[in-house]
């Protein structure tokens, strides 16, 4: 098991060597990984691609996938690639898409053509202030106790 996402919120199965993996015939989110420093940091992985599928067995794994050449180029060898996957219990396609977008925003995987920015911009809904979001209006000093 490997945890991915903001605050490592998703428990993915794997990582497993991609060359020997038989994907399940189920929907899921998957990430392609490699070890950037296998000799010194064998337990550290880098995320190079994230996607989702309605049926993981139809994604043309391991090396007929449309982005496989990018994966191999990044890892240096097809046998240095790893895969991990997440089945979203009760999750719809829209849930898998949201998880995929979040992971792409967090890791910025180089083999994904689409990238997402998790930043918030005031112009999206307008700037606002609320009295509950401001500083406390009491003259009591919290460091002195009750």
For the regions a language model picked out, list residue spans one by one.
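Boundary/linker segments flanking structured domains
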Residues: 1-146
């Amino acid at each position: 098991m490997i945890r991915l996402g903001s605050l490592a919120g998703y428990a993915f199965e794997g990582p497993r060597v991609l060359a020997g993996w038989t994907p399940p015939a189920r929907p899921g989110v998957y990430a392609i990984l490699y070890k950037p420093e296998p000799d010194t940091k064998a337990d550290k992985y880098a995320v190079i691609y994230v996607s989702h599928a309605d049926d993981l067995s139809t994604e043309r794994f391991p090396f007929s996938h449309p982005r496989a050449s990018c994966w191999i180029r990044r890892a240096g060898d097809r046998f240095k690639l790893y895969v991990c996957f997440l089945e979203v219990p009760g999750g719809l396609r829209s849930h898998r898409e949201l998880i995929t977008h979040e992971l792409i925003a967090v890791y910025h995987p180089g083999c994904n053509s689409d990238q997402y920015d998790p930043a918030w911009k005031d112009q999206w809904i307008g700037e606002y202030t609320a009295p509950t979001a401001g500083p406390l209006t009491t003259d009591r000093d919290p460091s002195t106790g009750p």
